[in-house]
Amino acid sequence: MIYCPSCGHVAHTRRAHFMDDGTKIMIAQCRNIYCSATFEASESFFSDSKDSGMEYISGKQRYRDSLTSASCGMKRPKRMLVTGYCCRRCKGLALSRTSRRLSQEVTERFYVCTDPGCGLVFKTLQTINRFIVRPVTPDELAERLHEKQELPPVRLKTQSYSLRLE
């Protein structure tokens, strides 16, 4: 979730684009009708590849046995994705096996080593960190939108809210 830097209320994403380094830049607006501040936020995806974040899963031993007994011409299962992770034990290539979402910000991913002699199964925790970069003025927002899309000027809409007290 993204929170407004002015009032602390929940904000929603208006526009988003990805940078070359994998960072997602978002233009967000506060949902509070009295604030409605517009600001720029950033979302970074990175995983914890430290040894402390990886652990051996003993309950997955049966998959290791099937890798050990397989022939040399064994093909990789289609559901596994090639990743940049290396096995902690033999430093071989590790493939993504399964993943599950623990919360909105944390995903638990299971990897398996492709070496038939090793077959280690380990897990990593991938976190999504959201942080506010800097506030964006409405003029800056309009300039950025016109630079990217080169659209005609956008007319500002006025919204009226009525509160009913009982």
UniProtKB/Swiss-Prot annotation:
Record InterPro entries: Znf_Ogr/Delta
**Known Pfam families for this protein?**
Ogr_Delta
| Record keywords | Activator, DNA-binding, Late protein, Transcription, Transcription regulation
Q: Which GO terms describe its molecular function?
A: DNA binding
Tell me the superkingdom of the source. Viruses
Role, per record: Positively regulates late transcription from 2 promoters in P4 and 4 promoters in P2.
Name of the protein in its database record: Transactivation protein
Per the UniProt record, the source organism is Enterobacteria phage P4
| Gene name tied to this protein | Delta
